[in-house]
Amino acid sequence: WFDEYLDEYPTWHINTSTPIFLLIDGTYYCGHCLIVYRAENLKRTIYYRFTRSEDDDEIASDLMNIRSMGYNVIGITTDGGDNIIRAVEYVYPDVPRQRCMVHVQRECLSSITLHPRTPEGRMLKSLIMSLSDIRTHNDMMWWLSRYNLWVEENEEYVCEKACLPNSTRTYFVRNDLRKAYVHLRRAIPNLFEFIKHPGLPKTTNALESFFGHIKDQLRLHRGLSETRVDNFIKWYLYFNDEKKSKR
């Protein structure tokens, strides 16, 4: 019976009248990419794509299909991928877009590490880690005041340049620290939309956890053909949604 399932794939219908907060993220498996569009407030997958990479034209096409299907998207949460961001801004320019806070933290910490050597780096790490504690408008304002003070006191130091020996070319003396600072600075305009729009997820953690479960299941079923792998994922999406809808 298992093979019979994988020779075909399911279809399902979701009510389009309910306003939705959309999560968008992609994951790679077996040389392929799965992009999932999930209505997080409904705990339902409304669209997905099997592709080779996170292509902005394809994602924009998916979003236009979602819009034409009648879904009322009132907020979107994404990671920091440029392709996804460009597609969202093209199709839904006026819809609030939340940057995944965990992705921002992860990217910044990959530059300065968990154990920064300088006081400036340790202060920035403290700011980055404390993002997780923000719940209210007052929390946000307090965090921004600390961030602005850090910038005022350290931006010149962080962005210091020097000349290469025997050359007019310059480089950033503390490039890792600067990369973390620039990444955080660019994320801030879309980092606190979840406060202005209650219900909008501040992370894509739900999808990342879901992707982890899918990959665990695929490892248990090694040897499936490409078509059956894709159908396996479609059934997994379907049964996961059905289980959530019956709770």
Question: How would you label these PLM feature ranges?
Answer:
Residues 1-82, 86-94, 187, 206:
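RNase H-like nuclease fold core
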Residues 4-6, 11, 57, 101-111, ...:
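Short alpha-helical interface patches
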Residues 30-33, 100, 108, 159, ...:
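Generic recognition of cysteine residues
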Residues 55, 100, 132-136:
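Alpha-helix N-cap recognition
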Residues 75-85, 122-247:
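Acidic/histidine-rich catalytic cores and adjacent linkers
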Residues 76-82, 87-128:
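Conserved beta-strand -> loop -> alpha-helix junction used to position metal-binding or nucleic-acid-contacting
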